[in-house]
Structures are given as structure tokens and as C-alpha cells.
Amino acid sequence: MPARTAPARVPTLAVPAISLPDDVRRRLKDLERDSLTEKECVKEKLNLLHEFLQTEIKNQLCDLETKLRKEELSEEGYLAKVKSLLNKDLSLENGAHAYNREVNGRLENGNQARSEARRVGMADANSPPKPLSKPRTPRRSKSDGEAKPEPSPSPRITRKSTRQTTITSHFAKGPAKRKPQEESERAKSDESIKEEDKDQDEKRRRVTSRERVARPLPAEEPERAKSGTRTEKEEERDEKEEKRLRSQTKEPTPKQKLKEEPDREARAGVQADEDEDGDEKDEKKHRSQPKDLAAKRRPEEKEPEKVNPQISDEKDEDEKEEKRRKTTPKEPTEKKMARAKTVMNSKTHPPKCIQCGQYLDDPDLKYGQHPPDAVDEPQMLTNEKLSIFDANESGFESYEALPQHKLTCFSVYCKHGHLCPIDTGLIEKNIELFFSGSAKPIYDDDPSLEGGVNGKNLGPINEWWITGFDGGEKALIGFSTSFAEYILMDPSPEYAPIFGLMQEKIYISKIVVEFLQSNSDSTYEDLINKIETTVPPSGLNLNRFTEDSLLRHAQFVVEQVESYDEAGDSDEQPIFLTPCMRDLIKLAGVTLGQRRAQARRQTIRHSTREKDRGPTKATTTKLVYQIFDTFFAEQIEKDDREDKENAFKRRRCGVCEVCQQPECGKCKACKDMVKFGGSGRSKQACQERRCPNMAMKEADDDEEVDDNIPEMPSPKKMHQGKKKKQNKNRISWVGEAVKTDGKKSYYKKVCIDAETLEVGDCVSVIPDDSSKPLYLARVTALWEDSSNGQMFHAHWFCAGTDTVLGATSDPLELFLVDECEDMQLSYIHSKVKVIYKAPSENWAMEGGMDPESLLEGDDGKTYFYQLWYDQDYARFESPPKTQPTEDNKFKFCVSCARLAEMRQKEIPRVLEQLEDLDSRVLYYSATKNGILYRVGDGVYLPPEAFTFNIKLSSPVKRPRKEPVDEDLYPEHYRKYSDYIKGSNLDAPEPYRIGRIKEIFCPKKSNGRPNETDIKIRVNKFYRPENTHKSTPASYHADINLLYWSDEEAVVDFKAVQGRCTVEYGEDLPECVQVYSMGGPNRFYFLEAYNAKSKSFEDPPNHARSPGNKGKGKGKGKGKPKSQACEPSEPEIEIKLPKLRTLDVFSGCGGLSEGFHQAGISDTLWAIEMWDPAAQAFRLNNPGSTVFTEDCNILLKLVMAGETTNSRGQRLPQKGDVEMLCGGPPCQGFSGMNRFNSRTYSKFKNSLVVSFLSYCDYYRPRFFLLENVRNFVSFKRSMVLKLTLRCLVRMGYQCTFGVLQAGQYGVAQTRRRAIILAAAPGEKLPLFPEPLHVFAPRACQLSVVVDDKKFVSNITRLSSGPFRTITVRDTMSDLPEVRNGASALEISYNGEPQSWFQRQLRGAQYQPILRDHICKDMSALVAARMRHIPLAPGSDWRDLPNIEVRLSDGTMARKLRYTHHDRKNGRSSSGALRGVCSCVEAGKACDPAARQFNTLIPWCLPHTGNRHNHWAGLYGRLEWDGFFSTTVTNPEPMGKQGRVLHPEQHRVVSVRECARSQGFPDTYRLFGNILDKHRQVGNAVPPPLAKAIGLEIKLCMLAKARESASAKIKEEEAAKD
């Protein structure tokens, strides 16, 4: 049977005024004069006004009465609210004494305002009434599917509300002290009140009896229809009475009234009938069961006679009424405003059903229909069809359990007949729900009605339950009543949409749990991918699952996941802590720890639950295993029992239901408690009280790292600055002084406490603080002078605990540092032995063997060192090779020599004086930081070094905020911040570039040059954006194009940031493209720019000629601090062989692609388990061997001596791999912020450990580990420390840093942690200097480890050589495509527009654009994307709150604002801003408040207050901005946020994402669209990899030069 829906809602502009008879008005005035108490006055007013109040006001009064009875509201508060409601209606009545006229369905004067009751009554009002004298007979609904001859009555008309006549009953009994009563008791109270108010009821019956024709009567009560029929005399009497009253109040005539207000008559008639008949019906039926709602709503069998409207008869009266209305004096402004406010407030509280909580004006509100010939539950259950026994059997009595039956064609509804779901907590709140349907025997699997027994008003439902899955996709759901249990089959047609949602949520829960079982590292985007690619079962009548499906059912899904975790062991990592579940919980605002009654809801049972045993065992070398086994000796538990007992102590938030329940007394933790007779040793919380909120908090603490890292004070230096009183008796010199230098006499040896020390020995030094360990140093000089006494020069060692390694370091290992100090000999404690452990000659082939012990035994005075340590940059390098000369052996200090050399390089100096002028001296060259600058060189200068002689238009600023219609855009108020993620408004300018014309020093007053004040005069170069053409010119020009100008500027030499090459394009021996690709820091110009005339000219000859400099290639280079500042051209062309590379966890090959572009690598092997990514790697690297196996299995094969794998692929052997790179996944141990026995076990078996074992076995020349930025912060940086510790133990030089990919030429913010390592004998690469400027907020790259801040060697912190790359640079040339575009190959339809696009397109012979495809989003998501404005910074907060027809034909609803948001207040129009009760003080979330299928996603305003208003979700990219970190699945509500195209209504395509990563257009991807997105999102941006590769290349060149020079020296020595 078709479900009945409420009529569509018409926008309400005003509330119709009530009309009171004169006698009622007079009585109200008398009440004001009577000396009544407030309570008595309110009671009398209610008695007088009750029948005239609007339905909405009555509902609110009922709600107030309920709150009073439940003692949720005080009597004073109740009286105040009732007075407010009555005054509201009275104020409207006083403002308008006449009804709005309605003619042929339209209101006069264009007034379309209607109240709720007026709208709902339209269905009956439009059907003409039958003659009053004709008796009515009930009519049954047709079952043959024919169209009904008259519209069905409105649900609002038939809604039963027995409490409307009992509002005053509480006054006599003391409302504040009254206890809550059952529904039956309230009904009895209703009867007594009706008896007392017979006169009032009689009057109401007399006024409304003739209007009862508008109400269809129940089919079961034809007798009542007769008793209710009026005689003609009674009608005439009533008509006379009304005429008399109308003459006094100028009310319309009865005919006019009947014509204009049929809806009001219907409403009044229904109210009268309900009051009259309610008690009699209640006596016939059980108090807790609803009335026969279907019978009440059956239309009559006979179609009533049509009554033609008589409009002309009332024409004169209409004209008089119109004239009276025009002459009525206008209301004062204050009254108008008050009335408007009243109207507004009434709109903010839409009426709800007091039973099921559904909105009464919801167009989707439906009413239950009973099956034909339905009977009550006891009668139904006794039907012989449901008996499973023969007539002779009496087995029923032998069962204690309730009988079980199947139920088909069922509907569930509340007392008022509204169809409602069973899973929203109504049953848990003791709301009585009933159902109807056809019951069948338990063995009958046929869902049809055949063979069933139809029942109605079954229940109420005591509980509902899920029995799991029937071996397939369908969940078995059941009800329990007091009489039986029912297993549900097929719902009725009207209930199918509601029940379908329940089946959907159960099936989605099954998908999620099964997905998390095998994907513990998954992200939210991965989960959405799984949901969207799962085909729904046929029974759900769904085409696809969407993200909206998951968010709609998030609370239920999370509860099921929590229940799944409860079934696990106490030491298991809960799967609800996976990254995807944490994101879902935040986004949907899920309440954790809700423990609903176990009997009411059971969890999905997994009969074949796969127990999570953690990751598979990692294959490790003995060295790697030894390090972990040693460090975690106390935490590794060999016995599983001990491991569980030593799990970390659980903490609780104390707020959620889980924390507040008592201990169970049954679990392992409880049995150990003293109160339950245990020992109390484990001190663990009850397993039933495992707090999900605290677990979430701890997991989140480890997930995101705050960008605003505080400045930490550096640790105190190891040396001592104080003098110590000397004891001459214990210190004596041995031998004579070696040399006397001024007051100092140098010695070779000294005797301290009978122990002889000599220069070069190592000692322990006493600290001032006795709690600190002894300091260790090498004695590099011994002397005595008259002022300080007996002294020595200490070159300090650094203990491993004082490095970034911290507690993971070897306690016997020391590190050299560039720190030294003069100390008194009396500070020496004793002599110690420090051994230098040099790498063995066969170091590269020793990988995987048993590690040799670095020291035999520990006598407390023997240590060793291998490496030198840079305390600022956390770099471990080979010790310096500086050797002393013969004449300074007695006082040579390596630290002093290195520090002096560095200071010399840093100090600017002038060289080669040219000319001495009056006020200055000219020079040809100058040095700074080891770099030589000559006249004619190009130099980088900071942006503030000089300005240009043209006034540029001010940078684009956000337009001032225009006033917004807050009713249409209710979430716009959340955009109070001007900051937009992905905006380049605060990006710095790139370096100024000049050509040195003069190097000079001004003269001092004595005529000598002031060489500490070096200045340079430069010719300015304009960039395209610096000319009058401004920023647009830069998009089409090459990024290294400049314009010469004759403008000059004088700049301090100290401000110079580096050297660059600027050439005239026509003078180049090769084309501009070849020149530009030949090395870094290369620029060219073709024209000169005249700022005065704003014109471009040919450059002058002196600009074209580089002067005496030639091209200045490679002259005068010293060793710089940053190798990136050097020109890349070597002095002698050296052919470098490419490194044989193994790429582990290669993905589609972004890292290898960057190394190939740098020209340093030949990737011969790659390991990638995920097949689509492995196939993509093969497509782009056809010469590589790609293994699609577990890396642990491959390493085990190699270590076992195998040369091929099971597929016959040749395995790389020891000595084959020269470079090892990869990005091991590390989310598996990121769930908790600190290590414990289980998380350590996960880490020990993680892929990071496997990767380190690869490094130890193969011992490559260079090693690179790439990972997410948080890799350096996981487990309080323990993962970082252990990784570096392994590399140091192997003998590698190593360092770590964080790089921003956006600074190396992509339009994307992507911070990545990089660990670099170089074998002994190689040079450890520096991190590449940034090439492009980028948003400062995204460039916080420092790392805090153990309260010490570490930075990398990067010096370009505030600017860079090139401008930032933008979204426009990236993809403005790509053709327009629509949502869901799927053509794999299309044409470009145009030339590249920017330098970046030219680089990525390359030189294709027949250009084809591949993978310009985008995800097909659901109809609702597509509608949201269409309504996101195109302005920069637009996101979900700019969505209008409107109804929209979706592409699938359905309608998206408006979002309802139903609660007062205490944080955000109300809108400017006074509208509410809250969508759930949790925004009100001290209230929890209301499951019934959830809204779905709305244009504004309900979950975002629900949780926005605690998540930065979800800024960026459904956000558009900005043409002049950049991408957020490209993820594996672009979702408008995912982490990446801004994934909408700047101008098109779709998410970004695969090719656009690939370009945001810097992949060339020729780079091939493999698989379906989601596979390709994942390949791109997981990759390392090739430009970043290229920049690192070029640094490695510099190190290889430096070593090659050293080898070449050493060879030349050997040859020269051999000749001699």
C-alpha cells in the first residue's frame, strides 16, 4: 500500500492571527482586573483560549507539560513559558482582527503566508463538503491499485494528541512535586478533567460540529458517526448565535467562512472529535497501543457531491471588508517589530512529534498502513497457521523462550502513526513503537503474503537485535515483544526506504570491519575508496555506496567497530584507532563510549574473525636485530602471557559511558584487583572500561605535529668556564718545556696523581654539577703561564646521549665535535682510552654477517669513536683528515683549525685592487662563504636590496567582505579568518638579480679603504612580473627570463645571497632550452627594459659583453658551506657512471624518475607489492626488474644464497647495489604515542626495520629513506633515533631533514622527512637549497627532538631564485572535462601556456593527453560542487541552504537549524545556528537530530566548532594558489580538502594531480581511476627527488676530483 506523505512545505512568511469571540475577549479583560494569582490567571486563560490556539502552540504547550511532569522544568519556568506562548498568540490576534481572505486557493493582497495547521489542512479543505444533513458512511481503501476518487486526508488532521485537553490538570495536583506517570494514568487524568470541563466541551462541540464533514471517520465506528450527526434545529440555533456574534465583531458570514477557511474548520472539527471520542476508544483498547490509524484514514467509499463555490453572493461583503481593512489605523512600529520577532521565533522551532521526534512538516513523513483483515497480536499468535506443532502435540508449553516467527510486509510506527526507524534510539528511550505485518512460521522462507497471518498494532517492541549474516550479504534483524520474537523478512512498500537505510548501515559496517581487519594502515580516503567501489547487494535497491552513506551511518558503524574491538584481547591495538576511523569520528561527530543496553542491540557477529596477530615477521640482519633486541631488552617479552600482563596502564576520560560504568569483576584485569581477591600487581583498568576517548587522544597526539615549534634553549656546553683551586702537590710537569711562546711554556707530558699524561691522550673531566657524568676530551696542548697556572687545551668528545640518538646510542661510543676549550689541569679526573674504529677495507662486503664487537669488555675507562658530529644540523660524518705540521704538533687542535677555516670563509674579503679613487677603492673580486665574486658576475640579492623605477599595481588582495544573506548562506559566518590554505598571498618575492659593475670599499678618514664595509654597484635585472605587464606576463615567460636595465643600485656585499649566471640569449652557443637545462642558477635575457617609457628595447653592447670575465665558468671556487651555491660545472669534465639502484617500496616510480632526471641513477631493480603500481613502474622503466613480492621474502632468499626468486627473476647480489632508496610505510605503529610491548613488537616487525636490513646487507654507497614529515616525530622521535642508530652502527655517515616539495618546483605543499646516508669514503650530501619561493606557513621545517631544535643545512629561508609555481602554471592548458570524465586519451586542444607546462609536456612528436579523467561523484556531491562559488577561498561554508533537484531526479533538502548554538549565537536575522542538541550547554548529541540528503552536509556544522569550522572542505583550488598535499583519493570532504577545480564543477583529474606532483605528461599510470590516483598520491614528487639527486651528484663529482688529483700526485711522485 502506498505510504502517505505530508504535503510539501510552503514557505511561511507570517502566522495567521487567531480570532476570538467578543465574550472571550471580555472575559480576558476581566481576568486582568481580577485579583488572581499568576497560576490561577494562567489556568483561566488556558481554559478560555485552548480551542482557539494554533496547533503549533498546542504542541509546544504539550511539550512544556511533559517537561513539568518529568521535573525537567520548574513551575515558575513553566508558567513563564506558557504566558509567553499565550501572549504570542494574543499579540497576533490584537494586531489583526480579520482573517486573511482566500479566493479559489489564493490569498488576497498577495499574502501567501500560512501557518503549519493551515498548510496541513489543505488536502481536506480543497475537497468540497457533503450536505450536512446526509449521514456519512465509512469507506474502505481500494486494494486493486485504482486511483482514489478523493484526496487522502492530511496526516496532521488525524494525529492523535490526547494530552491537549489536559494542560491545566497539573495545577490542582501540584506540578512541581508530581512524579512521572504511565500513559494509561495520564489518560485517566484526561477523563476526569473532561468531566469537570463539560460546559467548555459543549461550547466547543457546538461551534465546530458542523465542520466535522472535513474529517473522515474510522471504519470501525459507524455508530459514532450517527451519534455525532446534528439535527437541523441545532444547526439553525448555532447559526443564529454566530450571526449575533459576527454582528458585534464584524466577522465574515458562514458561507464566506466556509469558503475562506476550510482548513481551520477541519482543524477545529478534528480537535472536537478527538476530544469527544478519545476516552471511549481508550476503554476499548489496551492503553499502550495506538488507535487503528489505518482505519481512521480510510476515505469514504462514496464520492461526495460537489458544491459549486458561491463567490458572487459575497461580493458586496468582500468589498466592505476590504474597505474596513484599508481604514484600520496602522500599528505602531514597536508592535510591528515585536510581532515580526514573534513570527521569526515561531519559525525557528519547527513542530516535532512528541513521540518519535520527527518534524511534522517534513514532506517525507509517512504514516503506517495496516494489512487487510489485520488482527491484534494475541489473536494473530493463536492462529493455527503459526503453530509448528500438530493438533495432538503440546510442545509449546515446554519452551521457556518466546515463540519465533517470520514477519513480512511489515511497518513500524509510533503512537501517532508516523513510520519511524527502530535504530535511532527510540526504543532505548522507552518510546513505544508498534508494527504491523504478516506473520509466518519460522520455517517459511517465502517473503510473500501468501500463508501469513496479518497483524496490526503489534507490540510495543521491547528490543531489536541483529543475529549476524546468513552466510552471505543479508543481515538477519528481529523484534521482540512481550508475546513473541519476529525475524524480519521484506518490509512493506511504504516502509522499505526506512528499512533499506538500516540494512545499508549494517552492510556498510560489515564492509568497514572487514576492510580494517586487513588494512590497519588505511587512510580516510582509502576507506572511501573501498566504500565507493563495493557493489551493494541486490536487496538494498541501491546503485552505489557513497561517502554520504558512510557519514550518515557513522555512529552505528563506529559502535560496531568498538564492539568488534571489545571481542579482542586486552593488548590488541583497537582497529577504531586506525587513521581512517579517527578521521571518520572527527568528521561525523561520533560520540565514543556509548553503551546501550546489551539486550537491545547486539553486534554483528563475525563467526570467522581473523585475529590480528600483528605484522608478518620482518627479515632482519643480525646487526639490526641486535640493536633492537639490546635497546628493548626490558620490553621484549618472550612469553605471550607476560606480554599481555605488561600492557600499558589504561587511562580514562571519566566522561563517557564506558568510564562511568563499574568494573565487571570477570575480566583478567579485574581478577587481579585487590577488591576482587587479586594481587593488584598489574594495575590495569577493567577491560570493559577501556576508554575510547583517551585512546583517540593519544593516537591524535602522534598524528599531527604543530608547525609552530617553540624555540628550545640549547643544552649547556660540556666545557667549564670557572677556575678551580689547584693542588700543586698532585700535578707536576715531566721533562723540560718544548717551546716557550710569550708567557706560555709548552710541555709534552704531565704527571697527575702518579699518572702520566702526554699530548694526544684522552681524559675524563670533572663537571661542576656532580650529578652529571664525567666529560671526555682529548688533550691537544699542555702549558703553564703566570696568570692561569697549569693548563691544557681540551678537544671535547660528545657522548652519544648528547646527540640526536639520545638513549638509543651505544654507551661506549663517542663522537668528535668542533668544540674545544682551555682548562685547568686540576679538572682532570683520570686518564681514559678512546679508540678510533676505522671502517675495514672490506666494509662493503661485510653486510649481513655477524657484527664484530667494537670493544672487548667494559672497564669503565675505554671508549671508541667512528664519526664526527655536527650538533646544529645533526650530521654524522667521517672524521676530518686535517693533519698537524711538524712545527705545531705540540699544540695542534683539529677543532681550532676547522673553526678558524670556517671563520675565514665566512668573513667577506676584497681581492685584486684595481683603482684608488678619491672616496673609494675599486677591486676586481671579493669572497664570501668560500665563493668568489668578480666584476661582471650575476648575484642574488634579497628582495629588499633595491626597488624598481616603476610603480607596480599593489598585490591582489581579498575583496572586502560584502554583506551576506545569512538565511540563504547560514554557514558563511564561519569564514571569519582571511587566511586561506593554498593561497600565495603571503608568498615572498624571489631574489633580486643584478650584475656586478663595481666592487669597492669607501675610504676612512685616514684615507685607507674600510675593508670591513664592502659594497657592490650592480645593474638591475627586471623579471617579467617587475615590468608594467605585472604578474600575468610571468605565466607565459620562461621562469629564468630577465630583462636588462641600465638602472643601478649600490648594495652591501654582506647582503649577497649567492652567485648566478646571466647570459645574453643571442650569444649562447646552444639554444636557450639546452643552456637552461645545463645546470642550476642559469638565467638569460633577450631584451632591455626601459621603465620610463615602459618599453622593451635591444640591450646595449656593454650588456651583451661579459667583459674580462669571459663566461666565468668554475673560476676561483673555494669550499662553501652549502654546495648548492656553487656552479655545477666541474673544472675538468668528468664522466660519472650512473649508480646501480634498488628502489624498495617503489610505487609507480617518482623517486627513481627524479634520480633519472638528475642523471645519477640507473634503477635496475624495484620492489612493489601492489600490482597496479608495479605495472606502472614497468611501463616507465622497461629495463628494470620489478619484483611484486614481499620484500621480507626476497631478502630471506638473498641471505640464503639464492640467485633467483620463484618466478625466475634474477635477484641482486651483495656488491651489486650502489644506491638504495625507498619510502617504507610506517603507519602500522603510529596508533599510540609511546612504545609498549605490543607497539614495539609492531615496530620490530615493520617495513622500516626490513628496509634497514636491506641497507645492512647490500651496503650501498648511498642510502635514502623518504617518509611523511611525522616520521621524525613518531613515538617521541624514537623511530628516527633507532633508524639513525642502525646506520651509525653500520658505519654510515648520515643525517636527516625535512624538505618542502613546493620549494623545488611543484604547486603543492608536501613536507617530507628525508634520511640520507653515505658509505665510508663517500661525501655525505647536503640537503638541496630551495629553488622556488613558497608560502612561509608551509615552510616550517625544523624538528624538535628531546627539547632540542634541529634544522638542516638550508640557508635560503626567506627567498629563492625563482617565483612560486601556481595552479595556473600547472594545469591552465588542460581541456575542460566534466564530472566523471573517463576518456583515457584525448588531445590537448592548445599549446602550453606556461614554462612549467612546457617542461612537463616535453618534446612529444604527436602529443596525446592521457589520464585526464576524474571521479564520477554522486548526484548529491555533484550538486554541492555546482553550488560552490568560483571565488578564491570558496568552500562548503558558501553553500546556499536551498532545496535542489539532483541529477538522479531526487531532491536535496534544506538543512534545518533546530538548536541554539551557545558559542556562535544567532544570525543577524535571529535564526538558530545549531543542528544538534550538543551545541547547547551540557547536552549530549541527539541521534534523532541527524539530517541527510541536505545540500549543506549536516555533519560539518555539527562538528565545525571543534575542528576549525572544517575550513577547506568542498574547497576550490585557487588559480594563483597551490594544491594541498596530494592524497591517494581526492574527496571533497577528505584530508586534502580543496580538490575542486577552480572553474569547473568537478574534482581534480588524475593528470592534474600528476602535474601537481611534477610528473611529466608522458609518464604512464596503470589501472582504474582510483588506482591511478593512489599511485600519484603515494609518489615522491620527481622535482624534489631530482634536487636531492643533484646534491648526490655533487658529492660524486667531489670524490672523483679528489681521486683524480690524488692520482696525479701519485704519478708526479712516481716520476720524482
Swiss-Prot record:
The modification N6-acetyllysine is found at residues 160, 173, 188, 259, 366, 749, 891, 957, 961, 975, 1054, 1111, 1113, 1115, 1117, 1119, 1121, 1349, 1415. Residues 1-336, 308-606, 1121-1616 are annotated as: Interaction with the PRC2/EED-EZH2 complex. Residues 179-214, 221-267, 281-306, 321-337 have a biased composition (Basic and acidic residues). Zn(2+) 2 binds at residues 664, 667, 670, 686. InterPro entries: BAH_dom, BAH_sf, C5-Methyltransferase, C5_DNA_meth_AS, C5_MeTfrase, C5_meth_CS, Cytosine_MeTrfase1_RFD, DMAP1-bd. It comes from the Eukaryota. Sumoylated; sumoylation increases activity. Residues 693-754 are annotated as: Autoinhibitory linker. Residues 699-709 have a biased composition (Acidic residues). Sequence repeats lie at residues 1109-1110, 1111-1112, 1113-1114, 1115-1116, 1117-1118, 1119-1120. The modification Phosphoserine is found at residues 127, 133, 141, 143, 152, 154, 312, 394, 398, 509, 549, 714, 732, 878. A zinc finger (CXXC-type) spans 646-692. The modification N6,N6-dimethyllysine is found at residue 70. GO terms for molecular function: DNA (cytosine-5-)-methyltransferase activity; DNA binding; DNA-methyltransferase activity; lncRNA binding; methyl-CpG binding; promoter-specific chromatin binding; zinc ion binding. Residues 1-148 are annotated as: Interaction with DNMT3A. The keyword Transferase applies. This is DNA (cytosine-5)-methyltransferase 1. It comes from Homo sapiens (Human).
